[in-house]
Design a protein with these regions (language model features):
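Cytosolic juxtamembrane N-terminal segment immediately preceding the first transmembrane helix
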Residues: 9-64, 78
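Cytoplasmic helix-loop-helix junction between adjacent transmembrane helices
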Residues: 144-182
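Glycine-rich segments within core transmembrane alpha-helices of 12-TM secondary carriers
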Residues: 172-198, 316, 404-415
Length: 513
């Protein structure tokens, strides 16, 4: 059995390379899985780049709505008479409610596809945006923030979709850019919602407690529009939608229980769950607290605090993509080991800068400087993380993406509960403690080891192939005979580039497109 896999590996390389030129229905270079080999952010080419734009816009909308309360919190807490524990609990609810939703979303993507997953979660969370206009108590505020926060599960569909549409040579960049531009909503909402609030205040003749409620209609409408657009315009895979491919026999009908087991049994996934909890989880936490921190610590007005706070999220314009680019570049030079080193270095630097931001509590200018540098490392760590995630498992990619994405929310829940809910801990102290925690948790990158590629400190085993890891480990011999592993075989061939350069197959000149 093992020798048969080795034979497939040596015979499949040239076939996979020639397949790049075989399918003429695409106007851009694709690999043997019909995945795009490059990302052009200015292209709307269907289906690859159209999916890219729909995925990031759907995720962007969920971020805008989830953190819409943060820049208006000074008005909301006065209207609803909220205490610091009330605000902390609501912030927790906004990011905690989606933990289960993200785990579930992974299986949804594996079984029915990312298009349905992204669309349905946007439409289900839209009513909570509208209901925020009718909230009159702390309990109602908490429930609505939790319901709106479910929209953050769109992240899993976003990353799954990109991993299905883009080749390993640019998957880090595609994942990072789509997620980064989506996360940008957390920065945009910091200045967008105060502006909408100001406009509504004028429209309601100065009734400030009505103005913030009317402002919430905008996120609700955005959810509805994007949910419908993704449902009727998007496409799951380069070759078509899940339903068609299942019916035609071109795509395996996956068992949700089997894919759950494959994901849960992979220890690499759990290491990434923890580390992602302290990059994306930190971003969620900062989106919840930074505007109020600047407002209270430096006695700023609402719009100024929101505008400065938006600098944190606005780094997503380039910083998460930067992490993906560095990960892809290091992979070309050093293989998977380069990706792992990138994540550890950038995320450790994130923790150090977080501590420096806390120590700068007496200077607004220094606080903003370290906040921006800290933010860049946070987003870059997220981009570097999802340069690794697509390689943890192939058959259970959705499950792995779901759990790791949920780890981000779990990390935010832990940070909010430990450092920013108790009235006895000053916010700047909470930020400092969070920085030290980031540095410690990031050490979990060290034990991540791929048998064929190695880890940070140890090389891979040349006697172990990609087929051994992705096929022999995840499929039974009967399933292989039935042809269920054929699509994964193509993925294995396209993953040879994650080896150390000296171990990669030599491409013929005609195959280099």
């Amino acid at each position: 059995f093992r020798s048969r896999l080795q034979l497939r590996r040596t015979q499949g390389t040239s076939a996979a390379m020639s397949a790049d030129l075989a399918d003429s229905k695409f106007t851009i270079p694709v690999d043997s899985e019909n995945k795009a080999k490059s990302l052009n952010i200015f292209s709307f080419n269907f289906p690859h780049h159209a999916s890219f734009h729909m995925s990031w816009m759907g995720f962007f909308v969920s971020f805008v709505s989830t953190f819409a309360a943060a820049p208006m919190i000074a008005i909301i807490r006065e209207d609803l008479e909220l205490t610091k524990p009330n605000l902390g609990s609501a912030g927790l609810a906004a990011v905690t409610g989606t933990i289960g939703a993200r785990v579930l979303m992974g299986s949804v993507c594996d079984v029915v596809g990312p298009r349905y997953g992204l669309s349905i979660v946007l439409l289900l969370s839209a009513p909570f945006c509208f209901c925020m206009s009718y909230v009159t108590s702390a309990a109602g505020f908490l429930i609505c923030r939790m319901g709106i926060g479910l929209g953050l599960a769109t992240f899993v569909a976003c990353q799954f979709w990109m991993s299905c549409m883009f080749n390993g040579k640019c998957v880090g960049l595609a994942n990072a850019t789509a997620a980064g531009w989506g996360n940008l909503g957390g920065g945009v909402t910091q200045f967008l919602m105060p502006l909408i609030y100001r406009g509504m205040t004028s429209a309601t003749e100065g009734r400030i407690f009505s103005a913030w409620r009317w402002a919430y209609l905008v996120p609700g409408l955005l959810h509805t529009i994007m949910g419908v657009a993704v449902m009727f315009v998007g496409q799951d895979l380069p070759d078509g939608n899940y339903k068609f491919l299942h019916t035609s026999g071109q795509l395996e009908k996956k068992s949700a229980l089997n894919t759950q087991y494959l994901g849960i049994a992979n220890y690499r996934m759990w290491c990434m769950v923890a580390t992602y909890g302290f990059c994306f989880g930190v971003e969620l936490t900062m989106n919840n607290i930074v505007a109020a921190y600047l407002y209270d610590q430096f006695e700023l007005d609402l719009v100024t605090a929101g505008t400065l706070a938006s600098c944190y999220g606005l780094m997503n314009i380039f910083a998460r993509s930067l992490g993906g680019v560095i990960s892809d570049t290091m992979s070309l030079k050093f293989g998977m080991r380069g990706r792992l080193w990138t994540l550890w270095v950038v995320q450790t630097l994130e923790g150090i800068l977080c501590v420096f931001m806390a120590l700068a509590k007496d200077s607004l200018a220094t606080t903003i400087l370290f906040m921006v540098l800290f933010s860049i490392c946070v987003q870059a760590s997220e981009g570097a993380s999802y340069g690794i995630v697509p390689y943890i498992t192939r058959r259970a990619l959705g499950v792995a993406s779901g759990y790791i994405g949920a780890g981000g929310n779990a990390g935010s829940t832990i940070c909010m509960a430990l450092f920013f809910t108790s009235a006895s801990i000053a916010t700047y102290d909470g930020i400092m403690y969070m920085g030290f925690t980031i540095i410690g948790v990031t050490l979990l990158v060290v034990p991540i080891h791929f048998p064929m590629w190695g880890s940070m400190f140890f090389p891979g085993d040349p006697n172990v192939s990609e087929e051994d890891y992705y096929i022999a480990r995840e499929f039974s011999e009967e399933e292989i005979k039935e042809g269920l592993a054929l699509s994964v075989q193509k993925f294995c061939q396209n993953s040879y580039q994650e080896r150390a350069p000296s171990m990669r197959p030599v491409e013929s000149s005609e195959a280099k497109v």
